[in-house]
């Protein structure tokens, strides 16, 4: 998604807030080179990265090793399809799951979410991140690609918050929080000075769960639970 260091810092903060306390078990579905997994391991989580690419998993292992023994010992790589997590790791075996940048890249989104639900223990937490179709449409339109914007407005591979909530419900996952990442932040913001960076981070944190800002964010971050009915949440969250 073109997320820079600052964007990752914002996302990581939201993920840590959503997850149960360490040393909970977490599966990172489609975790690739392990940027998020290793960061979570650094906070004490026991993370299993599932990815189809052996090369990606090798990079993940090296990234973990570079962080030292304790972190490396908390990261495990498993080569396989994220749509088959219960078979790979065991039904209900994980306290939490993270799945970022994968949902809109698979052919069968329902199968992926069913897999994530199946690997979670009852009440387990899912942190789900994906490119926001509304943001993509706005970006295309502002760049003068009105035909591209129209295609996105009418549908396409990317999805919206409401569409994601329906998919989650079908998988037996209740949406409990939704936030935006990258409302104002851009990849080039990594070069901001310390004061500007702190101001931007605080701005992003304050608007992440508020409309209309959330719906115009680059990335949507959804938190769901297995087997838990959605509560009535404050208006600034859902």
Task: Please report, for each region that a protein language model flagged, where it lies by residue.
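A short glycine-rich, Lys/Arg-flanked "PGG" loop and its adjoining helix->strand segment in the class I
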Residues: 110-125
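Conserved alpha-helix/loop element of class I SAM-dependent methyltransferases that forms part
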Residues: 5-22
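Conserved class I S-adenosyl-L-methionine
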Residues: 23-32, 127-151
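Conserved Class I S-adenosyl-L-methionine
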Residues: 177-238
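Class I SAM-dependent methyltransferase SAM/SAH-binding core
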Residues: 35, 39-85
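Short alpha-helix
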Residues: 155-172, 178
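A conserved beta-strand element that flanks and buttresses the S-adenosyl-L-methionine
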Residues: 98
